[in-house]
Curated annotation (Swiss-Prot):
It is an enzyme of class 6 (ligase). Coiled coil: none annotated. Keywords: ATP-binding, Cell cycle, Cell division, Cell shape, Cell wall biogenesis/degradation, Cytoplasm, Ligase, Nucleotide-binding, Peptidoglycan synthesis. Belongs to the MurCDEF family. ATP binds at residues 102-108. This is UDP-N-acetylmuramoylalanine--D-glutamate ligase. InterPro entries: Folylpolyglutamate_synth_CS, Mur-like_cat_sf, Mur_ligase_C, Mur_ligase_C_dom_sf, Mur_ligase_cen, MurD. One of its GO terms (cellular component) is cytoplasm. Pathway: Cell wall biogenesis; peptidoglycan biosynthesis. The keyword Disulfide bond does not apply. It catalyses: UDP-N-acetyl-alpha-D-muramoyl-L-alanine + D-glutamate + ATP = UDP-N-acetyl-alpha-D-muramoyl-L-alanyl-D-glutamate + ADP + phosphate + H(+). Pfam families: Mur_ligase_C, Mur_ligase_M. NCBIfam families: murD.
Length: 422
């Protein structure tokens, strides 16, 4: 079979290796290629303009490529990674799948839930860690998948046993074109889920037509305290706060529902689940606190690539002066809601990246103190010169990092290095 892989990344490379083993002809097409060549694994790589849909029998799209891209528009046999993997399942091997999506918190919740389900041989994949085709080849029985809106947009058949949607706030609007498309992508899987599946959804979306018309069983949630009350867990029994408490509560709720499906009793597992969860360490660059040589508090929240994540960060330091580094690739999102929230905080802004001028204009409009620094190192230097012991220095950019860095991880590492440098 002639297979075209649209986009040359981790997901499609894993698929290419699988296709090659099964004697298929594989070609990559990507905007990053300016001429035909072979990559380091010997795969054929072509510029996007060379794609001929009549010379292809199957196209698998890398989730980061927008539905408006000419490659996607020209494709005649387009499938998502999820749908292709779903087509491989049969009576011999079909894993149990739990999918987790949301604007924020999906990585943390996926990691927490995978840890809780260790005894059931759970493995995580999708957006984090392992591509789905590698989980398939390992025949892992239980998949906990961090699932992006991009993957959900392209998926037309595959569905999980349990779908958890943590939240939906404005993000990725450049890719989706508008918020309605973004929300619909997050909810699309509910149109595919049968009566035997379960969706756990924020209460505020209860009346949405997609949810109303879905056959799936549904549980709606609002606050972490209410979830924990239903699970008969005191909120002070968990060592997390703010958004991380909600992530933990939702991981426990999914775990409890999974046990129920398996005809196992929650009370037999509850105490051990709490012990495991309280031993969980939040990953780097997510509200990661550290101190400089003068003992002043700095917080690396580089993973805050959208407004909602920064709003959550601000709540944590409600009664302290905050020196906030903000800016980067804002992905077409209107930052006004962030500036409206600044009215409730004592905050000084240090604007970096490609959105610095937009941030400066909004700061003037909302009468918020703002220095245009452009570079992260300059922002750190400015804060170092004024930061008091009882104040907070916070990197929570509300923006992606790719205008200046290779990833949010690099942005966070450089932030820490600049702070700790003499």
């Amino acid at each position: 079979m002639k297979i075209s892989l649209l986009g040359h990344g981790k997901t499609t490379l894993a698929l290419a290796r699988f296709f090659k083993k099964n004697h298929n002809e594989v070609k990559f097409f990507d905007d990053q290629f300016t001429s035909f060549h072979k990559d380091r694994e010997g795969f054929l790589c072509h510029p996007s303009k060379d794609f001929n849909p009549n010379d292809s029998q199957l196209e698998v799209v890398s989730p980061g490529i927008s539905f408006t891209h000419p490659l996607v528009i020209k494709a005649k046999h387009l499938v998502s990674e999820y749908d292709y993997i779903d087509s491989l399942f049969d009576l011999v091997f079909t894993p149990t799948i739990i999918s987790i999506s949301g604007t924020n918190g999906k990585t943390t919740t996926t990691e927490m839930l995978t840890m809780l389900l260790e005894d059931f041989k759970a493995v995580s994949g999708g957006n984090i860690g392992t591509p789905l085709i590698e989980l398939f080849e390992k025949q892992s029985p239980l998949w906990v998948l961090e699932t992006s809106s991009f993957s959900l947009h392209y998926t037309n058949k595959a569905y999980p046993l349990i779908y958890l949607l943590i939240n939906v706030e404005a993000d990725h609007l450049t890719w989706h074109c508008n918020f309605e498309n973004y929300l619909n992508a997050k909810l699309k899987v509910l149109t595919l889920m049968p009566k035997t599946s379960l969706a756990i959804i924020p209460l505020k979306f209860k009346e949405h037509p997609i949810i109303q018309n879905s056959q799936a069983q549904k549980i709606f949630f609002d606050k972490s305290e209410e979830i924990l009350e239903c699970l008969k867990i005191p909120s002070n029994a968990l060592f997390f706060k703010g958004a991380f408490l909600l992530d933990a509560a939702l991981a426990l709720l999914v775990y409890e529902q999974f046990l129920k499906i398996k005809n196992l009793k929650w009370q037999d597992y509850r105490e051990n689940a709490l012990k495991r969860l309280n031993a969980f360490k939040i990953g780097s660059h997510k509200m990661e606190e550290f101190r400089d040589k003068q003992g002043r508090l700095w917080v690396d929240d580089s993973k805050a690539t959208n407004i909602d994540a920064t709003l959550q960060a601000l709540k944590t330091f409600k009664n302290q002066k905050i020196h906030l580094i903000v800016g980067g690739d804002i992905k077409g999102v209107n930052l006004t809601p962030l500036f409206e929230e600044f009215k409730n905080h004592e905050v000084s802004l240090y604007a970096i990246g490609s959105s610095a001028s937009i941030i400066q204009a909004l700061a003037l409009e909302f009468n918020v103190s703002c220095q245009v620094c452009l570079k992260l190192e300059k922002a750190v230097q400015e804060i170092k010169s004024v930061l008091s012991q009882n104040e907070i220095a916070l990197l929570s950019p509300s923006a992606a990092s790719l205008d200046q860095f290779s990833s949010y991880k690099e942005r966070g590492e450089k932030f820490k290095a600049f702070v700790l440098k003499d």
